[in-house]
């Protein structure tokens, strides 16, 4: 893989990020309802994450967005818990350490924002992602926290920051 950089999202990244997220979801056979596929935020990710305590980061290689992930306060939850959101990578970069670097970037940002815990929800068949989360220190939960609207996600994890 060529060299890459992890950086904050810019307005001109919106279309590539939306296409990347939706292409990965289609590849994985994810339902279009009750998942990130239908999130209105996909239309303008820069605007969505250009707010207090929010950040979205992209992986760029040769002018192309090949991955991304974000941090935001956990929706409909009171407390110092953030959610790792919309972490997706193109197939060509999976398993090459890019996800671990992105995880580190996101968790460092979360700590800087004053969050004490980070929550993730995912789908049971996203095994590669779950391995990364567990290696990063996340632990399984019995049920969801907050109300993200992603009712098809049935795997919930949390990590102390």
Residue ranges and their predicted role:
Residues 64, 77-78, 86-104, 111-113, ...:
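Conserved glycine-rich acetyl-CoA-binding loop
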Residues 20, 116-119, 123-161:
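C-terminal "cap" of GNAT-fold acetyltransferases
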Residues 26-29, 45, 99, 137, ...:
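Residue-level signature of transmembrane alpha-helix interfaces in integral membrane proteins
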Residues 2-5, 85, 116, 153:
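Short amphipathic alpha-helical segments
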Residues 4, 8-91, 103-105, 109, ...:
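Acetyl-CoA-dependent GNAT
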């Amino acid at each position: 893989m060529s060299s890459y950089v992890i950086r904050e999202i810019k307005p001109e990244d919106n279309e590539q990020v939306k296409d990347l997220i939706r292409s990965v979801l289609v590849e994985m056979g994810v339902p279009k309802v009750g998942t990130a596929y239908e999130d209105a935020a996909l239309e303008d990710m820069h605007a969505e994450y250009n707010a207090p305590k929010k950040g979205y980061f992209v992986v760029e290689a040769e002018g192309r967005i090949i991955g991304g992930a974000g941090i935001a306060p956990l929706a409909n939850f009171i407390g110092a818990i953030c959610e790792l959101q919309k972490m997706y990578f193109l197939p060509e970069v999976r398993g090459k350490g890019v996800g671990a670097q992105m995880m580190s970037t996101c968790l460092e940002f979360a700590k800087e924002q004053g969050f004490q815990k980070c929550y993730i929800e995912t789908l049971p068949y996203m095994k590669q992602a779950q391995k990364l989360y567990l290696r990063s220190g996340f632990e399984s939960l019995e049920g969801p926290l907050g109300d993200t609207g992603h009712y098809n996600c049935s795997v919930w994890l949390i990590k102390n920051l």
